[in-house]
């Protein structure tokens, strides 16, 4: 969010399409119907706001939007189009984010100490301008997985994003 503000001349009003956990229980998988998997997360944060205050502001916004994960996805798209007057098949948000706070561990005594590692392979057809997935590793680190449209962005853009994110996080 801070990086998007930086590259947009200090814009305080930033919206990121924040992914909500997918259907995770057997009942949710077999219930039918539709459920939104993402929701716009809009925050207006001034440059004078300290890092922790901004983080809590974003967390509070996320907690409010997660309550609405049972909305119809088509309804949300229509509402966004009405509010921001976006053309058909476009989006107000240029960045999509999934944050997975827990490392994946297989709880199976038959596997003993065999470690599991999942690696994502994109098919090269990025449907969003930029989509970032952040997940934890078993050793306490983090994985950053970037998917982006090469017609609009280059690998150097992702390197800059990563560089500034690390400066922001570890400043």
Residue ranges of each PLM-predicted region?
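Short amphipathic alpha-helical segments
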Residues: 1, 5, 55, 59, ...
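Extended, hydrophobic beta-loop-alpha segments that form or line the acyl/peptidyl-thioester binding
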Residues: 12-19, 51-53, 72, 121-171
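His-Asp-centered acyl/peptidyl-transfer active-site segments
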Residues: 7-118, 150-154
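A short hydrophobic/aromatic micro-motif that marks alpha-helical segments and, especially, helix-coil
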Residues: 4-5, 84, 169-170
């Amino acid at each position: 969010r801070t990086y998007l503000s930086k590259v947009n001349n200090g814009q305080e009003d930033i919206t990121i399409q924040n992914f909500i956990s997918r259907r995770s229980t057997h009942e949710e998988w077999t219930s039918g119907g539709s459920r939104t998997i993402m929701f716009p997360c809009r925050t207006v944060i001034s440059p004078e706001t300290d890092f922790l205050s901004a983080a809590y502001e974003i967390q509070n916004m996320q907690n409010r939007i997660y309550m609405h994960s049972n909305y119809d996805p088509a309804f949300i798209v229509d509402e966004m189009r009405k509010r921001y007057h976006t053309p058909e098949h476009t989006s107000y948000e240029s960045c999509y984010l999934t944050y997975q706070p827990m490392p994946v561990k297989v709880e199976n005594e038959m596997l003993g100490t065999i470690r599991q590692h999942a690696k994502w392979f994109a098919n090269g057809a990025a449907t969003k301008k930029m989509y970032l997935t952040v997940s934890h590793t078993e050793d306490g680190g983090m994985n950053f997985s970037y998917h982006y449209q090469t017609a609009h962005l280059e690998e150097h853009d992702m390197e800059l994003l990563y560089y500034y994110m690390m400066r922001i996080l570890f400043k």
